[in-house]
Swiss-Prot record:
This is Adenosine deaminase. The record marks H221 as: Important for catalytic activity. Binds 1 zinc ion per subunit. The keyword Zinc applies. The keyword tRNA processing does not apply. Catalyzes the hydrolytic deamination of adenosine and 2-deoxyadenosine. It comes from Clostridium perfringens (strain ATCC 13124 / DSM 756 / JCM 1290 / NCIMB 6125 / NCTC 8237 / Type A). Its cofactor is Zn(2+). Belongs to the metallo-dependent hydrolases superfamily. Adenosine and AMP deaminases family. Adenosine deaminase subfamily. Gene3D superfamilies: Metal-dependent hydrolases (3.20.20.140). The active site is at E200 (proton donor). GO terms for biological process: adenosine catabolic process; hypoxanthine salvage; inosine biosynthetic process; nucleotide metabolic process; purine ribonucleoside monophosphate biosynthetic process. Substrate binds at H14, D16, G170. Zn(2+) binds at H12, H14, H197, D278.
Length: 332
């Protein structure tokens, strides 16, 4: 299989974890952000996960510089455009980009301006490249629940205009779900689709709770459903798609190597999986490389690939009309 040329769907990709190193250097100089060095390799070290990373918390530290650099509308628009451009070059036909709007208000932008600027970058790329994109608004679990209400209140104005879903992200504690039950009910009522980061760091039960209490239609990672039989069966029975990012899970020590990752086992047991990068820069990976690693490890064939692709289309939060177009890309 020529994996580069095959069509792809990416459903789990963080904007602030996917900046080009060159762009980070330019923006740091423009914004007067002082760095020890502006040399490519030195800046890359600030953005890409170090080999000695031992946890999700260590991994999340790589976001400090990108967040500093993305406090102006033109910067957000640029990095959204560039992410779409990069994805299009490896034949990604559709991507859902996620980011947390409340992290980008430090220099006076409103949430409305933040969201608009990212959508503008996505739409500009759509005009130039054979790719479509939508936005998922992430809320961070270490922020207050009131902050989720803020995101819903502003974000609902963009549903159907570039925003499709809401997400809970950040460090994952056991039993984090329950306090979000009411606010996620409100989000669903407002028209948001729901995907939740859960089961990334050892707690399969969080996946079960995210589906049952928050109405999650997709799960970010879901790596550890194998340690909770009820969660495993629920995901399988309800056809909930797991947005799986093996390289990221290796980086955060969820697993130690590709051979230990359950993505292929889940796929073969008819659990719906999507393969994504999570953070292209932080994990130093693109989607073609991720597929190559999975192909090399598990010897997936074209039928496996096609099944994952078509499932990813169905699991996406885009329009039915676009889904039908995307399905045609894989008919060979």
């Amino acid at each position: 299989m020529n994996l580069l040329n095959l069509p792809k769907i990416e459903l789990h990709c963080h904007l602030d974890g996917s900046l080009r190193v060159e762009t980070a250097i330019e923006l740091a100089k423009k914004e007067g952000v002082k760095l020890d060095s502006y040399e490519y390799d030195k800046v890359k070290e600030l953005l890409v996960i170090p080999k000695e990373c031992n946890s999700l918390e260590d991994y999340l530290n790589r976001f400090a510089l990108p967040v500093k650099l993305l406090q102006r509308a033109e910067n957000l628009e640029r990095v959204a455009f560039e992410l779409m451009e990069d994805a299009s070059k490896e034949n990604v036909k559709y991507i859902e980009i996620r980011f947390a709007p409340l992290l980008h208000l430090e220099k006076g932008m409103t949430q409305k301006e933040v969201i608009e600027s990212v959508i503008k970058g996505i739409r500009k790329a759509e005009e130039l490249y054979d790719i479509k994109g939508n936005l998922i608004l992430s809320c961070l679990r270490h922020h207050s629940i009131d902050s989720v209400y803020e995101v819903i209140e502003e974000g609902k104005n963009f549903i159907g205009k570039g925003v499709v879903a809401i997400d809970l992200a950040g460090g994952e504690l056991e039993n984090f779900v329950k306090p979000y039950e009411e606010v996620m009910k409100l989000a669903r009522k407002a028209g948001f689709r729901v995907t939740i980061h859960a089961g990334e760091t050892g707690y399969g039960k969080n996946v079960r709770d995210a589906i049952e209490l928050l109405g999650a239609e997709r799960i970010g990672h879901g790596l550890f459903i194998f340690n909770d039989e009820e969660a495993y069966n629920l995901v399988k029975e309800k056809g909930v798609t797991l947005e799986m990012c093996p390289k990221s899970n290796i980086d955060t020590k969820g697993v130690n190597k590709y051979e230990e990752h359950p993505i292929y086992k889940y796929h073969k047991d008819n659990i719906k999986v999507n393969l994504s990068t999570d953070n292209r820069t932080v994990s130093n990976i693109n989607l073609t490389e991720e597929f190559e690693n999975v192909h090399k490890t598990f010897n997936i064939d074209f039928e496996d690939y096609k099944k994952i692709y078509l499932n990813s289309v169905e699991a996406s939060f885009c329009s039915e009309e676009l889904k039908e177009k995307l399905k045609l890309s894989i008919i060979i």
